[in-house]
A protein has these predicted regions:
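NTP/phosphate- and nucleic-acid-binding module
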Residues: 1-403
């Protein structure tokens, strides 16, 4: 069983490189441990995840405010919150601070110490007052951010799971102290709902109540949502009750405009790691079956997550009449409607199908000689391999109904 699981990770890593999802960082110079570069389809997948998250938790709500804070912050931010003293992992019997330190300034006497942020949360807390002053929100309300974070991990490993540079999607949701348990449960349900919607296998999700000494120094309650990775059951996302720790650390408060009451809100924090989300979605989507006497690998993405919705292919790329029809009457039509449409005329049609299966493209559309006479095309389904003849005029609706 362990050998099969290791083999699955090898297949995922190999597919990601072969199909242009993810590459080792600085690969032509031997790489750099804990870093990865994103190829064309990896960027598309990651952007789909981020856009869906932002739409669900920001655009579709009236109590959420976005922010995009600077990666470099005044070092006093990290001193105030205890990160300089406490953000550490054990190493050789000592505590090793995993924040990446840097210097700002050109002249020696003006150089200031700063850090590459180890989390995106503080960028929201230091903008709490700005957000309240600008928008006058009523409790409960939240702030949301998507951005890079950095940690000097002692032992980066397991592909995207543990890296030194990664991306987070975080929410800080501000509530009254007496309401924290209600909203903790609310955000737990919201997180589980989002996981299912993006195509994570919910049979592989487990909730772990993190015990006192295992929790971060700012948390009074934490749940880890663990995923059954090939290398074991490990944290995917987290939900924390940060109490009033951060706002109190920054000496920030909130005045209720209705009764002029001054309070320090408490915070519920749903945290989503994008890189781990990508890995969980890839592992959930990866399937193999038998087609034409051969083993076929394909990524069964939800259409909303798929880097490509459909691939358009002229049956023969050396036949100008097929190429022209495919380009003008099919590709241009679908590209304008769906955006995530690509042109594929490389290799025979069987190889194109296999390539698009590994990319996770739900539909392949082939323009052949019959198309020139009856204005129909072959639409091939990724999951079943079945093919249908569809009128070009019906293509948009056909695809729209299935995504």
């Amino acid at each position: 069983m362990e050998k099969e699981e290791n083999n699955l990770m090898e297949k995922i890593v190999s597919l990601c490189k072969r199909r242009g999802f993810i590459f080792s960082g600085s690969e032509i110079y031997g790489g750099l441990a804990g870093t990865y570069d994103w190829g064309h389809f990896g960027v598309a997948l990651k952007n789909n995840i981020k856009q869906y998250w932002w739409k669900k938790f920001v655009d579709n709500r009236r109590d959420m405010y976005g922010v995009d804070a600077a990666i470099l912050m005044n070092s006093k931010v990290w001193e105030a919150t205890g990160h300089v003293a406490n953000f550490a992992d054990p190493l050789d019997g000592k505590q090793f601070n995993t924040m990446l330190k840097t210097q700002i300034g050109a002249k020696k006497e003006e150089v200031a110490v700063s850090y590459l942020r180890p989390e995106t949360a503080q960028g929201m807390f230091v903008n709490f007052k700005n957000t309240v002053d600008a928008f006058h929100p009523k409790l409960p309300f939240g702030m949301a951010q998507i951005g890079k974070a950095f940690r000097n991990e002692i032992a980066p490993r397991d592909f995207l799971f543990r890296q030194r540079e990664f991306e987070q999607m975080e929410i800080e949701y501000f509530v009254r102290k007496e309401d924290w348990e209600k909203y903790f449960e609310y955000w737990k349900d919201e997180m589980l709902s989002w996981m299912e919607e993006v195509g994570i296998d919910m049979n592989k999700i487990h909730e772990l109540e993190v015990l006192g000494e295992e929790r971060a120094h700012y948390s009074k309650r934490t749940i880890d949502f663990e995923f059954d990775y090939p290398f074991g059951k490990k944290e995917l996302f987290g939900l924390a009750y940060r109490t009033d720790f951060d706002l109190k650390s920054h000496k920030l408060d909130y005045i209720d405009e209705e009764n002029t009451e001054k309070i320090i809100p408490h915070v519920i924090e749903p945290t989503f790691g994008i890189d781990r989300a990508v890995l969980a979605i890839l592992l959930s989507a990866y399937h193999e079956d038998q087609k034409g006497g051969e083993t076929r690998a394909y990524l069964k993405f939800k259409p909303s997550m798929a880097p490509v919705i459909c691939a358009v292919s002229p049956l023969l790329k050396n036949k100008p009449e097929l190429v022209e029809y495919a380009n003008i009457k099919v590709f241009a039509l679908l590209k304008a409607e769906f955006g995530r449409v690509i042109w594929d005329d490389n290799g025979n049609i069987g190889k194109r199908y296999r390539r698009q299966d590994e990319i996770g493209t739900p539909f392949c559309i082939v323009i052949d000689f019959d198309t020139l006479t009856d204005d129909t095309v072959t639409v091939r389904d990724r999951d079943t391999g079945e093919q249908e003849r569809i009128k070009v005029t019906d293509l948009k609706k056909y695809i729209q109904d299935r995504i």
